[in-house]
């Protein structure tokens, strides 16, 4: 039982590692919270620091979700791995290492799925990138993909999977509430795939 509680804390702490902040400060000498949207996530890193930093942060944020979700399997615990994944996402959104001001749950949630259901992860990746290249709205693509994740979980019939996806989707949409207003008002920035970035 003690091991279980400790691993939940570890999962939260893994999620709390603010890679956008670390990359910004160490690699570029800036606090990314003071630039762009101020969000500690991949999208703001792409827009503020460029492709190299953006990919680095996004991959790192995905992997911390994957690693946290794998903890019960690594340590042989008979507890559903998605609970540990949820702890990591909570840490990503409300990181103790960054004054509880984190990202929007997308990349780390993807990492949770990568560990728990690679097939669903692959399907959602196709959905996300299809929407992104069609609409050029990262936020809209993220929210719609989150809803599709809920649908996929319902189809699976896995009750804990359904609960976890509903919680994650709710968190993703809640963290994008300001984006929803900007999309409606047509002021939401679009991804610029032709822009040259370092």
Swiss-Prot record:
This is Glycerol-3-phosphate acyltransferase 2. InterPro entries: G3P_acylTferase_PlsY (IPR003811). Pfam families: G3P_acyltransf. It is a multi-pass membrane protein. The gene is plsY2. It is found in: Cell membrane. Keywords: Cell membrane, Lipid biosynthesis, Lipid metabolism, Membrane, Phospholipid biosynthesis, Phospholipid metabolism, Transferase, Transmembrane, Transmembrane helix. Its main location: membrane. GO terms for cellular component: plasma membrane. Probably interacts with PlsX. It catalyses: an acyl phosphate + sn-glycerol 3-phosphate = a 1-acyl-sn-glycero-3-phosphate + phosphate. GO terms for molecular function: acyl-phosphate glycerol-3-phosphate acyltransferase activity. Its EC number is 2.3.1.275.
């Amino acid at each position: 039982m003690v091991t279980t509680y400790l691993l939940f804390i570890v999962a939260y702490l893994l999620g709390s590692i603010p890679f956008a902040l670390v990359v910004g400060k160490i690699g570029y000498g800036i606090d990314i919270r003071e630039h762009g949207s101020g969000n500690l996530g991949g999208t703001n890193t792409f827009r503020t620091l460029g492709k190299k930093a953006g990919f680095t942060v996004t991959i790192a944020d995905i992997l911390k979700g994957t690693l946290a979700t794998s903890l019960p399997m690594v340590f042989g615990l008979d507890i559903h791995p998605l609970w540990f994944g949820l702890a990591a996402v909570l840490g990503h959104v409300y990181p103790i290492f960054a004054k509880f001001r984190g990202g929007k749950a997308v990349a780390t949630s993807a990492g949770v799925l990568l560990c728990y259901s690679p097939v669903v992860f692959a399907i959602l990746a196709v959905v996300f990138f299809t929407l992104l290249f069609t609409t050029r709205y990262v936020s809209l693509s993220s929210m719609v993909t989150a809803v599709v994740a809920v649908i996929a979980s319902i189809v699976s019939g896995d009750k804990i999977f359904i609960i976890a996806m509903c919680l994650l989707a709710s968190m993703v949409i809640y963290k994008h509430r300001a984006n929803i207003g900007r999309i409606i008002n047509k002021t939401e920035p679009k991804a610029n795939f032709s822009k040259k970035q370092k």
